[in-house]
From Swiss-Prot:
Binds directly to 16S ribosomal RNA. GO terms for molecular function: small ribosomal subunit rRNA binding; structural constituent of ribosome. The keyword Iron does not apply. Keywords: Ribonucleoprotein, Ribosomal protein, RNA-binding, rRNA-binding. Gene3D superfamilies: Ribosomal protein S20. This is Small ribosomal subunit protein bS20. It comes from Acidobacterium capsulatum (strain ATCC 51196 / DSM 11244 / BCRC 80197 / JCM 7670 / NBRC 15755 / NCIMB 13165 / 161). One of its GO terms (biological process) is translation.
Amino acid sequence: MANHVSSLKRARQTVRKTAVNRANKSRVRGSLRSLREAIQKGDVKAAQEQYKATASALDKSVQKGILHANTASRYKSRLNARVKALATQAA
């Protein structure tokens, strides 16, 4: 356990920041899950709408330092390819 005043403060800050980071990461994972479920169901319109929300959540997570920019870009690229494939398959 921390003994110095500064280390006690850092411990408190870590607890708060961990909670915020966990909530943000959970939000991104939930958005990804919703998009994958929409793709799995084959609902093109829902998948396209959910992709917009997911891309936004990924971009926000990059700004907050939750994900690396390349990781978010990779997710968006792969998910967009799946949504486009679903749209062309349905058409």
